[in-house]
Amino acid sequence: MEKEMSRNTWTMRDVFRLSHPKGVNPAIAEFILRGEVLEEAPDIIHGYDAMTKVTSVNGVLSVLEGYPNLPWETIPTHLLNDPEVWKALFHNGQLRGQNAIRNVGRLNKINAFDDMVFAREFANVIADEDNIKASRLHPINYLNAITANRQPGYYEVMETALPGIVHDALNDGFHASFKYVKPANKRTLLGLDVSASMTWGNAIGLSATPAEAGAAMAMTIARTEPYYAVMGFSRRFVDLGISPGMTLDSVMRKTNSMSFGGTDCSLPMEWALKNKVEVDTFVVITDSETWAGRKHPYQALVKYRQQMGIPARLAVIGMTSTGFTIADPSDRGTMDFCGFDTNAPRVLTDFSAGRI
């Protein structure tokens, strides 16, 4: 509540008006509906109210000392440019998990990492495996932070403009996070677009290129799913030879070296049917070209299901696309992704597992 009192013209008061919640703490309701802070209101409301009145960094630090559970979103924007504010938030435990990863660039920009002790403490947190596990951080979260802070002029995926200790911690966290990805435990076939256009621009929702995000997802599937194949849309639909032990840069070099063909989203099903390969979930990752063949992918999926006797699912991810239609809206076994943000991998896994 205290993080998002309003967003996109909607307020918490609108939520109350439309949802008619029951059993709400009267002091919370009074605050949301009328802006009144009653004496019996929870501490976090008193803290939020106090933070709205501060006019200086010292005022922020004083409120954070009295109300350590306040998140950074409660602090006036113009006072978030001081490193001491972020250090206080960090030491209050408010910069953990995704909050820490998302704010790496901001902390670097305001020179917070010039404090060597803070840089070490922060690096320890973002690379800590207990924190990764508890926060359910995905490799894509780390990849996004790394590519968002990429060193200008560098082409290697893992080079950044960050201090070495933070850069190394992001790398360590990226590789450590794979072991905590919850698998779908399905036989998964990934078809990956290897065309040059995958290296142009960023995926919608990420700071990474479609090629980088696709390579990270290939690594995720290879390292977490017990049964998988990673194929490329080259001149033929070919096995890319992606193994669990490969690094992101090595996967990128592998895909960049392939000659490419059109991204025909029906090919994975046609190839699997022709070769009698049993697949539970087909995943296609491309930039925006989602249908370059004569047969609609959904028709190929239906044929595969009928002839193999497997209720296979199909997810098509257009990382730079703002709209396409592959999935049948009436078929729960198909899903289209337009763009690919840091929440998308979990949605994909839940879809593959049949949880959604």
PLM regions: where:
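Long lumenal/extracellular ectodomains of secretory and single-pass membrane proteins
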Residues: 1-211, 223-356
